[in-house]
C-alpha cells in the first residue's frame, strides 16, 4: 500500500519543491493543504508537476460563509483531540492587537475555528495521512492541525528555519528530537572554509 504524505504548502514553495522531489523518488499518494494568498494559490491550482491526489486551499475553506456556529461541535473537537481552541485563537495575531484591517468578533473567530476543525477532521479521518511535512507553526491554525494529527498518531515532521545550507528536521516545534553527544562529532582542526560549508 502506498504511503499517504500530506504537505502544508506556503507561499515560499519550499514544501512544493520538497513534494516535487519526493514524487520523483517515492511511490506515494501526495496531498497538500495550501496556505497562501490568491496569487500563489492560482499557481498551485494550475501546476502540473506534481500529481496531488487532493489539494485543499485553506483561505477558501476557512472563509466559507458559514453562519451556523455550532459550539457543541467545537466542544466535541476539544474533548476528542484534547485541545483548547479558544486559547489557540487568543494567541493568533490576526485576531487581535496586531491586525488593524478588521476587528474580529468572538462569533467570527469561532466560525473560522469551526471551519478549520471541520477541514482538518475531514482530512485526518477520511484521507488518513501517514505523514505530514510542514514548517514550524507560525499561525494558530497550523498548530491546531499539528496537535490534531499528533492526537491521532499521525507522524508530523517539521522543517526548521535553514541555517546556511543545512535544514533541521524535527517532530516538535519546541525541542530537538535527539541531540548527539558532543564527543560524537569531531570539530578539531576545522578551518573557516569548513565552517562555511
Model-derived features: where do they sit?
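Histidine-anchored nucleotide/phosphate-binding helix
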Residues: 9-26
